[in-house]
Each structure stands twice: as structure tokens, then as C-alpha cells.
């Protein structure tokens, strides 16, 4: 993703979000409760080309867009489902 905003930290989770998105807030709350470090990239402060490239890469037009260890998992509903099935911890450990 040449134009998409990137992160240089070692956080296992990256969330592409906007400040007014309730699902973005819920995803961050879930990760915070679990003690999982994450990078939060605010798409509202990024150039339109960055958002367009991210949307093209993931085929999703909504936020949040969540990556765990570089793997796109989807939005909040998918993150929550992974947590409920016990799969999120496995992804984070792997």
C-alpha cells in the first residue's frame, strides 16, 4: 500500500478508523480491555488517496478496518466474533 498510511510501531493490531465511528470506539475498547496494544490510524486526517487505496486493498468501504499481525480481519463485528470464539488470542500469540 504505497499511499495508505502505515505504522512503524510493533503493535500487533492496526485499526484504521475515524473519530466519530461508534464501531471504531467499540473495537478500541475491546482491545484496551484485553490489554492489547494497537495503532490507531485516523483516516479522516489522511489524504483521500490513502483511504481509497486501503478500501481497494480490503474491498471494504466502512470503518473500522482492523489488521491483526498484518492480516486483515474485517471490522468490529469480525473482531468481536474472533474474540468470542477464542481465536483472537491465538492470532495475537501466533
Which residue stretches match the model-derived regions?
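Local sequence-structure signature of Cys/Sec-based thiol-disulfide redox active-site neighborhoods
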Residues: 2-41
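Non-catalytic, surface beta->alpha helical segment in thiol-disulfide oxidoreductase systems
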Residues: 68-94
Amino acid at each position: 500500500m504505497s499511499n495508505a498510511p502505515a505504522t512503524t510501531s510493533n503493535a500487533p493490531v492496526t485499526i484504521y478508523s475515524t473519530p466519530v465511528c461508534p464501531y471504531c470506539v467499540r473495537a478500541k475498547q475491546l482491545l484496551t480491555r484485553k490489554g492489547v496494544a494497537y495503532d490507531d490510524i485516523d483516516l479522516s486526517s489522511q489524504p483521500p488517496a490513502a483511504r481509497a487505496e486501503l478500501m481497494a486493498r480490503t474491498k471494504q468501504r466502512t470503518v473500522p478496518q482492523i489488521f491483526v499481525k498484518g492480516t486483515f480481519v474485517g471490522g468490529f463485528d469480525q473482531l468481536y466474533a474472533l474474540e468470542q470464539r477464542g481465536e483472537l488470542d491465538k492470532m495475537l500469540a501466533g
